[in-house]
A protein has these predicted regions:
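Residue-level signal for secondary-structure boundary sites
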Residues: 14-16, 52, 61-63, 102, ...
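Contiguous, well-ordered beta-strand patches that form the walls/edges
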Residues: 36-87
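Short hydrophobic/aromatic-rich beta-strand segments that constitute the beta-sheet cores
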Residues: 8, 31-34, 51-55, 90-95
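Edge beta-strand at a domain terminus
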Residues: 21, 45-48, 91-115
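Tryptophan-anchored aromatic micro-motifs
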Residues: 1-16, 92
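Short, flexible N-terminal segments of the mature chain
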Residues: 21-32
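Short, solvent-exposed aromatic-acidic interface loops
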Residues: 12, 34-39, 56-60, 96-102
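Broad, structure-driven detector of short, well-ordered beta-strand segments within folded domains
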Residues: 24-26, 42, 83, 109
């Protein structure tokens, strides 16, 4: 994985209806990013087209829609992921532990700029 600014598009699995989009800044095995409601930081390792890591996500802004049911519901959530990368794109799969429930997801990252 090249250092840079990446867009991320996440689709939840396990029958959970949820998705999110945001940005991540990856640099030398660490990353930081977020979207309008959540921020995340984590670490990763990579080699020969594969990468894996761990991310901790927190909510920074509550939803204004009272009918919205955020998957993470204001909790700090730890997620493990692994995936592949080639050129400026990556596909990852992971699992988040939300309380006592595990929620899977897949995400696509696209490199936007150097940092």
């Amino acid at each position: 994985m090249r250092n840079g600014l990446y867009s991320i598009h996440i689709q939840m699995g396990d029958g959970v209806k949820g998705r999110a989009s945001g940005v991540l800044m990856l640099r030398d095995g660490k990353f930081l990013g977020g979207d309008p409601y959540f921020w995340s930081k984590g670490t990763y390792t990579f080699r020969e087209g594969s990468w894996k890591g761990e991310v901790v996500t927190n909510q920074h802004t509550p939803y204004h829609d009272p009918t919205a049911r955020p998957v993470f519901a204001g909790r700090e959530v730890t997620t493990g992921f692994s995936g592949t990368y080639q050129n400026d794109r990556s596909e990852v799969f992971g699992t988040s532990l939300v309380g006592s429930r595990s929620v899977s997801f897949q995400a696509t990252l696209r490199r936007l700029a150097d940092i």
